[in-house]
Structures are given as structure tokens and as C-alpha cells.
């Protein structure tokens, strides 16, 4: 049987329909798109789409798919493009919301997408209402060869969501690798210099330090993992991307100043105020090394032996004793972290830090002494030792 939807008509026991109640006016529906709109026309040449808030139909070749990990979408690019750069981007992100993975197209599929155009934190996208396979495949997309992205947001806008083949880059920071799977990259073979390492502090926008800060920001690009998950919170049991590989059976350091080469193309994205290189599918520490977008030489092994080559008669070391406080939490109040047996061990909140009880302090001291002796250094600098006056008010 065929069914159609309509307004419900409840009846009472006498089969008489009650008088209709006034209803709030419904939101006007977006008019159906007429024909296929080129992706470049959706993107336009400015920061925002000229077709923002309109419903359009467009078509393209699927170049990236992220059905897992939080991005919840895929990218399409105009068939046959990529050999040369154009004034407007030929690619766009298609947001799928909570649609299941089996409704996503596959890489290299040719599809038609109907959806509403929007700007999501500065990134042009379509929110898909329909996605359908084309009967005739489109011409393949060629990764655009770009040694390095131009500097600044305006110059990078034509590359938004495009499939590109970058040149060599250098790791300039890995602050967020353990949390969001991100690695900061600088174009070429040198990391970006810390401005305050060269120039004196200043808030003057024309000062050398502010100029270099701005220059660094315009050069920086973030290598991402194709996911938005937080490895410190929601994905604690997922191995980190890049430094872990092959189902976490391979561990490979990725250090600042390491030079990386791109063994696979990436998608240019923009989110959270950063331009990004996204792998064409999500990567975690379970991915094979050969499937990662980058390759690099592990520089750590060579550095481990560097200290043995230093000439001299004395060794100098540094050791963080991790909140060595002789003023105990049980004396100055506050809450405590407990061990498996419920014993109070370490200060959680309070005036002091470190050990909560005398027993915990003695245990900490034994471990510190053993570790310091293991350094076998002639001179050792210690950090995180209690400033007694700040706690007790006693200079002694």
C-alpha cells in the first residue's frame, strides 16, 4: 500500500473531529534549486560564499571522507580540476550531521549534492539534504602541486577544501599532538623562530616582535588527523596519530625541527582560526605508516648519543622533583588525592602542594634521591621545590 503524510485528525468516541486549533506558521521551505551550480560559484572569490543561506545543487568528485572522529562530512571537488590554481576554490565541504557512515560516499565517487550553503567558523560548507551517485563518472581530480601555501588568510582562500600535494615542511610545534592530534608546520626546512627569543617584548604593532609574530601566524599551517576528538578526554584509549603507527606497534618520535615530506595528498581546511592540512580519511595510531600523509626520519636516536660526544670533565643535569613540599597538606588543610586503598597521598586543593602526609613525603623523598643518584651528574639543578615563605610566611 502507498501512504502519504498529512495533518492528524483525532476523533472523540463519537467519531467527530474536534474543531481545528490555530497553529504557529511554519518556517518557509527553501525553494528547490534550479539546475546544478558550479562549486566555484558557490565558493566565490571572497571570504564568504555569495550564495550563503541558499539551497543549491552541485556535483563533484569525492576527495576526502570523515565519517568517524567528529568532522562528520566529506569534500567534493569539480571534476577535472587541480592541474592549475584558480581564483575561486573548486572544492567544498559537505556536512552530513548525524547520518550513519553507510550513507557516506567513497573516495573518488562522483556525486550530486543538494544542500544549504553556510559559513561554519569561516569555512564554506553545504549541509547535505540529498547525496546521490552520478550515472556518469566525472573526470578525475588532480592534486594541485603547492610547495607551500601563500601567506595570510586572503591568499589561502582559493585553496579552501582543495586536494593538494604540498612540498617539504618542518615541524615547528607539537603542543597539541597529545590532545587533538595536531602538528604545527612551517614551510621549507626551518622551524619558525620564537619572536621573544630574538626581540624584546612590546605591544606596539610596528615593533619587531609583533611583526614577526604576525609573520609566523601567516606562514603556519597545522597538520591535523581528520578528527576533532580530544585524546585526553573522549579518546583516551585511542593511540595518538603519527607518533604511533601500525595498530600502535610502531612508535616513532616527531620532534620540532624534523622535516616531513608528503607521501599522500591532503585537503586544505580552515577551522578554529587555523589553516590545516587534513588527511583524506581520519588517522589514529592504528593507521599504517604507509597510509599517513607524511613521512620523516626519526631524529631521536641520533640525539640520544649526542651527549656522549661532548668534551669536558663535568656533567650538569636538571631534575624536576614534582612539587617537593615539606609543608604537608594535613597540616595546612585542603583536599587530597587518594591511593587505591583510600589513603590520602597528594594535595588536591589547598595552600600547599605535593605530599599530604609525612608518610607520603618520605616515600617521595626516597624516589627523588634514587632518581637523582641515577643521573650520575656532578652538578644538578632542581625545580618545583617549595617556597616556604609563600606557604608559611616564615623566612626561616
Model-inferred region functions:
Residues 4-17, 27-347, 363-370:
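Extended non-catalytic accessory segments flanking core domains
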Residues 20-22:
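Intrinsically disordered, low-complexity, repeat-rich polar/charged segments
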Residues 350-359:
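The substrate-binding groove and active-site-proximal loops of carbohydrate-active enzymes
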Residues 358-396:
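Active-site surface patch of divalent metal-dependent phosphodiester/phosphate bond hydrolases
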Amino acid at each position: 500500500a502507498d501512504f502519504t503524510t498529512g495533518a492528524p485528525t483525532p476523533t472523540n468516541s463519537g467519531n467527530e473531529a474536534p474543531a481545528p486549533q490555530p497553529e504557529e506558521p511554519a518556517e518557509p521551505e527553501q525553494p528547490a534549486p534550479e539546475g546544478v551550480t558550479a562549486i566555484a560559484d558557490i565558493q566565490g572569490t571572497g571570504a564568504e560564499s555569495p550564495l550563503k543561506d541558499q539551497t543549491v545543487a552541485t556535483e563533484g568528485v569525492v576527495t576526502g571522507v570523515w565519517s568517524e572522529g567528529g568532522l562528520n562530512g566529506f569534500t567534493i571537488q569539480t571534476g577535472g580540476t587541480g592541474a592549475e590554481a584558480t581564483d575561486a576554490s573548486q572544492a567544498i565541504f559537505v556536512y552530513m550531521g548525524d547520518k550513519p557512515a553507510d550513507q557516506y560516499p567513497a573516495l573518488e565517487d562522483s556525486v550530486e549534492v543538494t544542500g544549504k550553503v553556510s559559513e561554519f567558523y569561516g569555512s564554506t560548507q553545504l549541509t547535505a539534504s540529498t547525496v546521490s551517485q552520478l550515472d556518469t563518472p566525472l573526470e578525475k581530480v588532480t592534486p594541485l602541486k603547492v610547495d607551500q601555501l601563500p601567506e595570510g588568510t586572503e591568499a589561502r582562500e582559493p585553496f579552501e577544501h582543495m586536494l593538494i600535494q604540498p612540498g617539504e615542511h618542518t615541524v615547528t610545534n607539537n603542543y597539541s599532538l597529545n590532545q587533538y592530534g595536531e602538528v604545527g608546520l612551517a614551510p621549507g626546512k626551518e622551524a619558525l623562530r620564537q619572536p621573544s627569543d630574538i626581540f624584546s617584548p612590546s605591544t606596539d604593532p610596528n615593533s619587531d616582535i609583533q611583526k614577526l609574530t604576525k609573520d609566523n601566524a601567516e606562514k603556519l599551517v597545522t597538520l591535523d588527523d581528520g578528527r576533532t576528538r580530544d585524546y585526553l578526554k573522549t579518546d583516551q584509549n585511542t593511540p595518538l596519530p603519527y607518533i604511533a603507527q601500525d595498530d600502535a606497534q610502531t612508535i616513532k618520535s616527531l620532534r620540532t625541527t624534523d622535516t616531513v615530506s608528503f607521501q599522500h595528498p591532503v585537503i586544505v581546511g580552515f577551522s578554529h582560526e587555523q589553516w590545516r592540512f587534513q588527511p583524506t580519511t581520519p588517522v589514529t595510531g592504528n593507521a599504517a605508516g604507509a597510509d599517513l600523509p607524511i613521512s620523516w626520519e626519526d631524529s631521536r636516536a641520533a640525539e640520544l648519543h649526542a651527549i656522549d660526544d661532548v668534551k669536558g670533565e663535568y656533567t650538569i643535569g636538571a631534575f624536576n622533583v614534582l612539587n617537593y613540599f615539606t609543608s604537608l597538606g594535613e597540616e595546612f588543610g585542603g583536599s587530597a588525592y587518594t591511593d587505591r586503598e583510600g589513603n590520602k597521598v597528594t594535595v588536591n586543593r589547598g595552600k600547599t602542594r605535593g605530599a599530604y602526609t609525612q608518610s607520603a613525603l618520605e616515600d617521595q623523598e626516597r624516589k627523588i634521591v634514587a632518581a637523582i643518584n641515577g643521573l650520575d651528574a656532578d652538578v644538578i639543578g632542581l625545580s618545583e621545590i617549595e617556597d616556604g615563605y609563600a606557604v608559611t610566611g616564615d623566612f626561616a
